[in-house]
């Protein structure tokens, strides 16, 4: 048996060698295989390296080469994100190294540095200056400059580096760094990172790494190996990285997280939001701020599992993403207070009024320690007290302040003192100025168009509504997340009283309102609060008076997210255009034009004509013709079709009485 098996094996091997020899004999070395060349291989079957065109991009102090094909992700829209991150990490390094007696030097900053910005003044140059502290005689200050290794500096990780642009910018623009780990799971991306590191001469600071970001962070859980700064900017949701991130960041370290899955966080898929972030998102006008608070809740919830908690420094909603900067601390006593920092949201589906219900209750005791217990609720009745509609339940979400205004002021002051440092400095100043004006203890907001559309009245101006709230002794502010937001500590009843008073100046035709509509029920109640719409000087915020760039319009076409990076992918612009072409005319029902809509509406009888109240006559978009009587099958004659009936055929309309 063994001999026969060996003989069969040798026979098959000889047959393969013979067939291969015949193939190469037929494929003459002098004649290249044109079919193989067309398929992307060499003339004799070997694989040829695919020619990839590369593009060089200069952003900040970095110069990056990346392939034009969509193999490595790069989005120029995120320049504001990267500029803001550099500014935040710089101030964080100033705080951390300042405690060690190390001063950082930022190119463009003067010896006298601004430390306080007086936002109450209209002149943007009116800033308080503070001289640097005098050192003791004979002492030499320790300094840290950009591009140099600081042995006591920050250990930074960029978990999803792609082309390495962000990490290289950290090395070239942020002082006080010990090392920067630029990690990515893609081999193509890591090769590009190595090339860009050599191109910018930052190999002494930036360390390329190829690994799964989660496993890399899990391997740095030890206190001595943790990172001082972790930056996560994934394509889509960062939910799968948060558990590892809260364990790998050092005590008091900085965690920078970007979420670009705004469709999920804004309430389009509440069940998906719950599976990723542990909270139900609601469709509301305040969805962008609620998205920020859901991300903060998710971070704090994951940190609590390891006796850690988060302290938000800055939370931004911009363009198509949200970005949060938090510090992570350890403390069992502080973790107990986390439940009282979260809240559920009861939102009326009719008028949009919302109420918050805290998950926990913290009360003080004579000994000085806080006592925690379950909260009592709910804060609403089954039906809305304003319009009688039902409530939707969302959350939990972070209900505490989402910004550290002192830290925001430091970043704003540094950017204002050195406007040439970033390309988007003007926008950073505008957004941070609005943030400093926000009410820190008031979650969520209403919008002008929401309030007016609910009762079908004209929209008051921003200054008129803000003045009415200020005259009623309520606080009011804008929100960086929405340009027509009204963030106020006034209850919903006071807001609707103000809108009732406004409606009296611009009356609504009550006969057009349904008795069950929110507008009818709200306007049927007389206001208890008499609103005063006289414009007040303090109703116009300082950032608006100074004309800062607070809410940037899209500067170019296709301003938004880019396609995901794919191996061997097409150029980003080409891929987007092909996607648009493939999706054209793929709707279930093509949009109808004006004539088609008018013809369709004419098939419906006019209800007001039946009641005798329609005054439009022939101009009415609905039909005034009497309904055609239906002919039952029993009453139909048995005679054949007459000559005046239309014979059936293509495009023939159905006769009277036929459904």
Curated annotation (Swiss-Prot):
S-adenosyl-L-methionine binds at residues 82, 166, 184. Residues 55-499 form the Trm1 methyltransferase domain. PROSITE patterns: SAM_MT_TRM1, ZF_C3H1. Residues 1-23 form a transit peptide. The modification Phosphothreonine is found at residues 628, 646. PANTHER family: N 2 ,N 2 -DIMETHYLGUANOSINE TRNA METHYLTRANSFERASE (PTHR10631), TRNA (GUANINE(26)-N(2))-DIMETHYLTRANSFERASE (PTHR10631:SF3). GO terms for molecular function: RNA binding; tRNA (guanine(26)-N2)-dimethyltransferase activity; tRNA binding; zinc ion binding. InterPro entries: SAM-dependent_MTases_sf, Trm1, tRNA_met_Trm1_C, Znf_CCCH, Znf_CCCH_sf. It comes from the Eukaryota. Zn(2+) binds at residues 348, 351, 384, 387. This is tRNA (guanine(26)-N(2))-dimethyltransferase. The record marks 530-531 as: (Microbial infection) Cleavage.
């Amino acid at each position: 048996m063994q001999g026969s098996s060996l003989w069969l094996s040798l026979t098959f091997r000889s047959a393969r060698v013979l067939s291969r020899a015949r193939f190469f004999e037929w494929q003459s070395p002098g004649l290249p295989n044109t079919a193989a060349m067309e398929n992307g291989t060499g003339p004799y079957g070997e694989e040829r390296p695919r020619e990839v065109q590369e593009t060089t991009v200069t952003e900040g102090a970095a110069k990056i080469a990346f392939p034009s094909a969509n193999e490595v992700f790069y989005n120029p829209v995120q320049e504001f994100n990267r500029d803001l991150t550099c500014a935040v990490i710089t101030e964080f390094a100033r705080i951390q190294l300042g405690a060690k007696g190390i001063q950082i030097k930022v190119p463009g900053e003067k010896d006298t540095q601004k430390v306080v910005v007086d936002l109450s003044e209209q002149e943007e140059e009116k800033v308080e200056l503070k001289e640097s502290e005098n050192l003791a005689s004979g002492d030499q200050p320790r300094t840290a400059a950009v591009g140099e290794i600081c042995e006591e500096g920050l250990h930074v990780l960029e978990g999803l580096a792609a082309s390495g642009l962000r990490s290289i910018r950290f090395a070239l623009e942020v002082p006080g760094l010990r090392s920067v780990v630029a990690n990515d799971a893609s081999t193509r991306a890591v090769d590009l990172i190595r090339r860009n590191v050599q191109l910018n001469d930052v190999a002494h600071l930036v360390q390329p790494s190829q690994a799964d970001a989660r496993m890399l962070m899990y391997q740095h859980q030890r206190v001595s190996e943790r990172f001082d700064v972790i930056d996560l900017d994934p394509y889509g949701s960062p939910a799968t990285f948060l558990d590892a991130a809260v364990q790998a960041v050092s005590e008091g370290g900085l965690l920078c997280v970007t979420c670009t899955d705004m469709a999920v966080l804004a309430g389009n898929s509440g069940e998906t939001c719950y599976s990723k972030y542990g909270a139900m998102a609601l469709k509301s006008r305040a969805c962008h701020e609620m998205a920020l608070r859901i991300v903060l809740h998710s971070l704090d919830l994951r940190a609590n599992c390891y006796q850690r908690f988060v302290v938000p420094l800055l939370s931004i909603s911009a363009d198509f993403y949200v970005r949060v900067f938090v510090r992570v601390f350890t403390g069992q006593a502080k973790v107990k207070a986390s439940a009282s920092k979260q809240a559920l949201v009861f939102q009326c589906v009719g008028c949009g009024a919302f109420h918050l219900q805290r998950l926990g209750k913290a009360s003080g005791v004579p000994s000085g320690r806080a006592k925690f217990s379950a909260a009592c609720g709910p804060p609403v009745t089954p039906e809305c007290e304003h319009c009688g509609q039902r409530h939707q339940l969302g959350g939990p979400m972070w209900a505490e302040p989402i910004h550290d205004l002192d830290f925001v002021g430091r970043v704003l002051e540094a950017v204002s003192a050195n406007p040439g440092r970033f390309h988007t400095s003007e926008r950073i100043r505008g957004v941070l100025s609005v943030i400093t004006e926000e009410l820190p203890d008031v979650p969520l907001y209403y919008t002008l168009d929401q309030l007016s559309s609910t009762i079908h009245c004209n929209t008051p101006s921003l200054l008129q509504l803000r003045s009415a709230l200020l005259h009623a002794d309520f606080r009011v502010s804008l929100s960086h997340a929405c340009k027509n937001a009204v963030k106020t500590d006034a209850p919903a009843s006071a807001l609707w009283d103000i809108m009732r008073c406004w409606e009296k100046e611009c009356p609504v035709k009550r006969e057009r309102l349904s008795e069950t509509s929110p507008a009818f029920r709200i306007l049927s109640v007389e206001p208890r609060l008499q609103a005063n719409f006289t414009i007040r000087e303090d109703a116009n915020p300082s950032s608006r008076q100074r004309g800062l760039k607070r809410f940037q319009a899209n500067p170019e076409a296709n301003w938004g997210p880019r396609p995901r990076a794919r191996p061997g992918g097409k150029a980003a612009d080409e891929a987007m255009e092909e996607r648009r072409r493939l999706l054209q005319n793929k709707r279930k029902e093509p949009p109808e034009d004006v004539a088609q809509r008018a013809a369709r509406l004419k098939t419906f009888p006019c209800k007001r004509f039946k009641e005798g109240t329609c005054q439009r006559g022939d101009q009415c978009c609905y039909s005034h013709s009497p309904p055609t009587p239906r002919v039952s099958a029993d009453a139909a004659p048995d005679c054949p079709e007459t000559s005046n009936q239309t014979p059936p055929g293509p495009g023939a309309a159905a006769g009277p009485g036929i459904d």
